[in-house]
Amino acid sequence: MVDFAEHRKALLCNDAQSIADYESAMGEAVKAVSAWLQNEKMYTGGSIKELRSAISFQPSKEGMGVQQSLQRMIELFLNKSLKVHHPHSLAHLHCPTMVMSQIAEVLINATNQSMDSWDQSPAGSLMEVQLIDWLRQKVGYGSGQAGVFTSGGTQSNLMGVLLARDWCIAKNWKDENGNPWSVQRDGIPAEAMKNVKVICSENAHFSVQKNMAMMGMGFQSVVTVPVNENAQMDVDALEKTMAHLQAEGKVVACVVATAGTTDAGAIHPLKKIREITNKYGSWMHIDAAWGGALILSNTYRAMLDGIELSDSITLDFHKHYFQSISCGAFLLKDEANYRFMHYEAEYLNSAYDEEHGVPNLVSKSLQTTRRFDALKLWMTIESLGEELYGSMIDHGVKLTREVADYIKATEGLELLVEPQFASVLFRVVPEGYPVEFIDSLNQNVADELFARGEANIGVTKVGNVQSLKMTTLSPVVTVDNVKNLLAQVLAEAERIKDAIASGNYVPPID
């Protein structure tokens, strides 16, 4: 027999008991988060081995109920999670979040709107369109509706290279009737499969290669060019590469420029890249997933000069905009280029709806069902105002330059790349230490500090050198916070360096 009372209690609906349970459990959850925030330890989950033994999924026929399940998750998940707001959590583009973003998440989750069709998110659809228009004006595209919120940079970059490829093939290939070739209708011409190329720098985000492979073009379709000493795309090498490809009969569909590379935070010379792509008739996509935050900067906006010249742009708001994951956007300069991915489904975006101006946003997205993540950015901008928001973004740039100066002046530390944005690449180099052990030393310093829950420092490569990385984007981290962290780094290196050199060291990750 169906127990509708229990069904109603389990759903978030207008049932009195459901509402009471929701209010009570949400109150308990907020209290638990508050307690977790006040614990000053960055991480208390232990090693991978310890976590693996502690975590167990426990389904049952009867269930354990809301309260018991919540208490179990407070201990199993919340208390074992990384505190991304902690001043020593600097490894990745993994930001602390705005209070308004967290409040917006409650509204997003409770209403459960879906952004594919207007009748599934009436207010949200119109709000997203307005926010896209505002973002377009901020980047310099001008007013318009060509753009959509996405899950993040990988999806936005996929949209950029997908549209660029199909635009390129339509421009350079004809079907049997002499019309521009439609990849959407007819697939990829065999000749185009071999000859269409996308260019990016050697430090571009891996999603460029990954997306081209998913599009059926393979890694072979991506040509990388070197970077200069500032980790920016070498524009002389770019021009030589494009000339060489053209001479070979290849067609460059797109050049992906980066505004804020993942490791160095490098911003490529956007205006010069646009000049070169214009010369060869190629699309220019800018991956500004990180550096795009500077469109709100009070001080450093000029670092993005030329962004307005691009054909498409990736923005991520769950990086330097301090929004909860996930929240990104794709902006398209010329709305006509959406034709390469347009698909009409009678039950979502019918011709009738389009004739009457109904904003069914599925037409602009690779996703169908999609969260109203735009609400987080909307509420943050309206509540903070652009000046305060810009100040919070600018802090990371200023802090990074101060940290770089400190590293250069500190014995035992070496700055590997002069920073541009909000990332510091450095390493520990003890005086007289055997060079063959320096990479291992730096790797294990980071691993040791994380295993004890004291710091989360990134590990990457600069050329062939093992590098430590601090992504200094937090608007509340101070120079003194970072100095204290660097003192821990040096102390840890001193503690383990002899064991590493003698071969007696046991890595904490084992």
Swiss-Prot record:
PROSITE patterns: DDC_GAD_HDC_YDC (PS00392). It is an enzyme of class 4 (lyase). GO terms for cellular component: cytoplasm. The keyword S-adenosyl-L-methionine does not apply. Its cofactor is pyridoxal 5'-phosphate. One of its GO terms (biological process) is carboxylic acid metabolic process. Pathway: Amine and polyamine biosynthesis; 1,3-diaminopropane biosynthesis; 1,3-diaminopropane from L-aspartate 4-semialdehyde: step 2/2. CDD domains: DOPA_deC_like. Keywords: Decarboxylase, Lyase, Pyridoxal phosphate. The modification N6-(pyridoxal phosphate)lysine is found at K319. One of its GO terms (molecular function) is diaminobutyrate decarboxylase activity. It holds the Pfam family Pyridoxal_deC. Its EC number is 4.1.1.86. PANTHER family: CYSTEINE SULFINIC ACID DECARBOXYLASE, GLUTAMATE DECARBOXYLASE-RELATED. Belongs to the group II decarboxylase family. This is L-2,4-diaminobutyrate decarboxylase. It comes from Acinetobacter baumannii. The gene is ddc.
